[in-house]
């Protein structure tokens, strides 16, 4: 890994000895010099017990569930506060325009979203369906 950063710009620069902690539910971006696999060791989170605090402005979040889910349904409880959701491929969900071309939220992927107000995202358990 050459560099990665979290939602607030804190950087992980291993060649310079700069380290950060990953925060539960938060996403991060990584710039690498070649194809890489990131292995994260820890306890698997129960999505229904892990609310994600969303700040006003831009956020990067992790998708914590084990199965893909419809983006519109995942964000239905907070959609009035969501301006845009973006995946890593450039697909978007604009709630105000009733437009979504993100196929689904997928385990292991992160998402950027812009909030018009702070809110809390609460995922359903892995036993429930959207």
Can you say where each PLM-predicted feature lies in the sequence?
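N-terminal exported-region signature
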Residues: 3-130
């Amino acid at each position: 890994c050459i560099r990665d950063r979290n939602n607030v710009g804190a950087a992980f620069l291993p060649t310079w000895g700069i380290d950060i902690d990953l925060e539960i539910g938060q996403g991060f971006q990584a710039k690498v010099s070649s194809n890489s696999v990131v292995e994260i060791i820890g306890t698997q989170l129960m999505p229904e017990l892990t609310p994600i605090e969303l700040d006003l402005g831009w956020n990067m979040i992790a998708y914590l569930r084990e199965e893909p889910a419809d983006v519109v349904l995942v964000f239905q409880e907070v959609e009035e506060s969501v301006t845009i959701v973006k995946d890593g491929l450039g697909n978007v969900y604009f709630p105000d325009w009733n437009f979504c071309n993100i196929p689904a939220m997928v385990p292991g992927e992160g998402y950027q979203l812009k909030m018009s107000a702070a809110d809390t995202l609460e995922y359903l358990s892995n036993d429930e369906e959207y």
